């Protein structure tokens, strides 16, 4: 390329450092073990209170499927939510979504609309709404968010909770726990390891399913595999209009320099997928949930490719105004859990369906 990338916000040094330390039981992890013990005691006490106190977890009048991670950082939760929503609709359900909305600037409970700024509701809830068309409500209190969702859309007959695995106040019927190739890392709790809670934490759900966003199971827990691949690429303006990505468009970027920009938890995974597709990419890794307050690539950059999670923070008019010479492409991820996973989900939800007779 003709110019080096500008001084964009890079991944937080502490975040990147700990992510590496969490893969092994080295000196840093051992030094953090006392803090992990305190954290573990607090987690165990919280879970015990919910387990022993009837009514502490609130039922909202609809089946609830919670999708989340046992580990810190991205493991494939958002594409799992989108895949589950598509499957539920094919099965005749009318799903809605509740989410905390990580990184949002607004407070309280709020419905997500296609034109809601990502910083108001969070990048992942906005992406889920745009990709699935499902109604989404964000709020730190998932019970309040679910109540608002059902008031606005009473026809909803199943609620999918995005990243609510540790939010015990919302009672759930099914838990989907997502792991990637890191598995449980070094097997220790935060901050000595990546675990938010032990991987074998008793579930408050009737059914717990484990899904591996990896080539093979990465923990001892039995689970299901998923196939993941880039579906292609699409111009940013066309992406906002709902145009699907095309493999031919992605292939057309081969043989020329492309800046790959990613503000996600595991940016290297995105870069590797682009290289696997035959692209010659220059990497620009930003912090997870990067706000894109300033566009991080120089005006001389001819082609930039981003994830969908970042695309929701890039309005077309702004990009054209601030980087008129740059073509921005979006590379969506196709995330396809194996059929046995969906069969298990259907089995768990069948007794809870409002359409069930007798």
Swiss-Prot record:
- Report the top EC class in one word: transferase
Reaction(s) catalysed (UniProt annotation): a lipid A disaccharide + ATP = a lipid IVA + ADP + H(+)
Name a GO CC annotation attached to this entry. Answer: plasma membrane
Q: Which SUPFAM superfamilies match?
A: P-loop containing nucleoside triphosphate hydrolases (SSF52540)
Give the enzyme's EC designation. 2.7.1.130
Pathway noted in the entry: Glycolipid biosynthesis; lipid IV(A) biosynthesis; lipid IV(A) from (3R)-3-hydroxytetradecanoyl-[acyl-carrier-protein] and UDP-N-acetyl-alpha-D-glucosamine: step 6/6
GO BP terms? lipid A biosynthetic process; lipopolysaccharide core region biosynthetic process
List ligand-binding residues for ATP.
71-78
A GO MF annotation of the entry reads:
tetraacyldisaccharide 4'-kinase activity
What keywords appear on the UniProt entry? ATP-binding, Kinase, Lipid A biosynthesis, Lipid biosynthesis, Lipid metabolism, Nucleotide-binding, Transferase
One Pfam entry name: LpxK
Family label: Belongs to the LpxK family.
Stated role: Transfers the gamma-phosphate of ATP to the 4'-position of a tetraacyldisaccharide 1-phosphate intermediate (termed DS-1-P) to form tetraacyldisaccharide 1,4'-bis-phosphate (lipid IVA).
| PANTHER family tied to this protein | TETRAACYLDISACCHARIDE 4'-KINASE (PTHR42724), TETRAACYLDISACCHARIDE 4'-KINASE, MITOCHONDRIAL-RELATED (PTHR42724:SF1)
Name of the protein described by the UniProt record: Tetraacyldisaccharide 4'-kinase
